[in-house]
Amino acid sequence: MTQSALHTEFGGIAALRDALARRQVSAVELAQSGLDAAQAASGLNAFLHIDPELTLAQARAADAALAAGTAGPLAGIPIAHKDAFVTRGWRTTAGSKMLAGYASPFDATVVERLAEAGAVSLGKLNCDEFAMGSGNENSAYGPVRNPWDTRAVPGGSSGGSAAAVAARLVAAATGTDTGGSVRQPAALCGVSGIKPTYGTVSRYGMIAFGSSLDQAGPLAPSSRDLLELLDVMTGFDPRDATSLQACDGQANESGRVRRGHDAAQAGYDAAGSQPLKGLRIGVPQEYFGAGLAPDVAAAVEAALAQFEQLGAVRVPVSLPRTELAIPAYYVIAPAEASSNLARYDGVRYGHRAAQYGDLNEMISRSRAEGFGDEVKRRILIGTYVLSHGYYDAYYLQAQRLRRLIAQDFQRAFADQCDVIMGPVSPTVAKNIGDNRDDPTADWLADVYTLGVSLAGLPAMSVPCGFGGQDGRRPVGLQIIGNYFDEGRLLALADRYQQVTDWHQRAPVSQDA
């Protein structure tokens, strides 16, 4: 199994952009190499949809723009999109049989903005069905395998994105994060990934799971690469009702407000130019309890020690409702999912049962056949907690708890620390099938990421070591910031990556 494409010979996105500008390599060469690598690594099952003609057409357009001097900041950079973003030309399934064969007539805003910047898409990436899962085992099209150890899960729900980046099939990928679905697979696959502040990246064209939680974010080898993508992806979008006006900028010719290379870059520059001496790193005691595996704890502690050597100060903090984030999330997210997924009934689009008697039977059969077990489970939970007899007892209580969780974070940032650091996941990647008989075990894997999502804060995962019995399963460090603090998070990650090489390590070839 070939694990890397031509782009790896040039380094990160900035170096690759320079190589393209100097004509040391062409966008077509990069695209063809990526397509070849993706085919050779098909055993990972990271890609769901590849169309070489579409990819090479984009690459030729990028080469033409480079020759004409009109290239965007990502011209020719090979990327791929999680199959939760609708894409004109490529099928979009959200990892579900329900949407098998669906072709969107438009691009998601994230896809559109990256295309406008010149990025070349190699295709659509596998994911847990409707982004519901922590191991990418819930896809209707089979599980994704972790490039570091193909017996292991890559994490989820953006497992295809993390696996493709880790295997160096693409320079970067898009993902979505509802309860940890960018950060957790990034950690388990040894790549960098960031969930921005809720509302800073448009959700338009992103297939909805939990609308008050869903947020798009990029995955790439390094924090500098993440900054390159995030500066293109962020910005106010009037087509998304949850898009924040705080991200506005100049309107383009179409009238759509866009933000360019500003807030995240400014925060990155400001934080990157300052010494770390005196930076207060909050370390939650609840993140280092009995549930944290020793190998993960050791890697995270070593990363914290590295920051201390750089001048930062470690400060103990408390997030007392950390474990309560699990029940709060698994009330709120399923409630929103049950509403969002009600549209898939086989009438307008989506899977339609072949045999049925009347309209009601057609809808019930179509949904029974089209949805997988985990999606059905969450729809049932969501319907239950929204029912008349239980709405107050479950849903409203969960929303109250959500507010208290957000207040815990704000109290820590206001009085005690500048950023918060800890593990992303309590363990390294499990083997595929380990939790097949206990589906709720995957829910517990997000204990350190759910509170951040409920609060709407930005957070990222940075590779910080390895664990597992053979020492080859990656561990991620989670860096959490206050609202709109993405630039600082990326700058801190970059300072760490300047003195460590975890993000530069790639898995050796192995048969999948």
Swiss-Prot record:
InterPro entries: Amidase (IPR000120), Amidase_CS (IPR020556), Amidase_dom (IPR023631), AS_sf (IPR036928), GatA (IPR004412). One of its GO terms (biological process) is translation. Transmembrane segments: none annotated. GO terms for cellular component: glutamyl-tRNA(Gln) amidotransferase complex. Keywords: ATP-binding, Ligase, Nucleotide-binding, Protein biosynthesis. It is an enzyme of class 6 (ligase). GO terms for molecular function: ATP binding; glutaminyl-tRNA synthase (glutamine-hydrolyzing) activity. It catalyses: L-glutamyl-tRNA(Gln) + L-glutamine + ATP + H2O = L-glutaminyl-tRNA(Gln) + L-glutamate + ADP + phosphate + H(+). Pfam families: Amidase. Its EC number is 6.3.5.7. The active site is at residues 82, 157, 181. Belongs to the amidase family. GatA subfamily. Heterotrimer of A, B and C subunits. Allows the formation of correctly charged Gln-tRNA(Gln) through the transamidation of misacylated Glu-tRNA(Gln) in organisms which lack glutaminyl-tRNA synthetase. The reaction takes place in the presence of glutamine and ATP through an activated gamma-phospho-Glu-tRNA(Gln). This is Glutamyl-tRNA(Gln) amidotransferase subunit A. It comes from Bordetella bronchiseptica (strain ATCC BAA-588 / NCTC 13252 / RB50). The gene is gatA.
